[in-house]
Design a protein with these regions (language model features):
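Bacterial N-terminal signal peptides
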Residues: 8-17
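Bacterial N-terminal signal peptides that target proteins for export
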Residues: 1-9
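Surface-exposed repetitive/solenoidal architectures
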Residues: 21-140
């Protein structure tokens, strides 16, 4: 019995520290928008977009969905606070690699800054990457 109690107490004190070291998923509003309130939330959102295998869209205009088309990720977010990225190197939301592997991913959702500021953005060249900025590749 004492071991169980010790385990539960330990879990209560240790569990909150894990989220401080990793990215945490932001909550969503009633419309499904992710509510970004920290740098960790923004990084999580970026990683969801860039790692997604969402719908493929006719991005080359030939009227068909085929291997020449890009993946378009339709996730939506709202900033709920000013974000400070602290000057660490930033990987853009959406990837354009000039047709090279890995496959290109376009951000095709809504990103509502709601008047908030993102500062401390540090964009560095990434080998094989052809796009830079907060957003690297967006769908029109």
């Amino acid at each position: 019995m004492m071991n169980k109690l010790y385990f539960y107490c330990l879990a209560l004190f240790v569990a909150p520290t894990f989220s401080a070291f990793g990215q945490t998923q932001p909550s969503q509003d009633e419309n499904g928008y992710y509510l970004i309130e920290s740098a960790e939330h923004l990084k999580w959102f970026r990683d969801q977009v860039n790692a997604s295998e969402h719908e493929q869209v006719d991005t080359n205009g030939d009227g068909q969905i085929n291997m020449d088309d890009d993946t378009v990720v339709r996730l939506n977010a709202k900033l709920t606070a000013d974000i400070d990225l602290g000057g660490e190197s930033w990987t853009p939301i959406g990837e354009y690699n000039n047709g090279e592997e890995p496959d290109e991913v376009r951000f095709g959702g809504y990103f509502d800054g709601q008047g908030h500021v993102i500062k401390g953005l540090n964009v560095q060249p990434i080998d094989g990457r052809q796009s830079y900025g907060l957003f690297g590749y967006v769908a029109w």
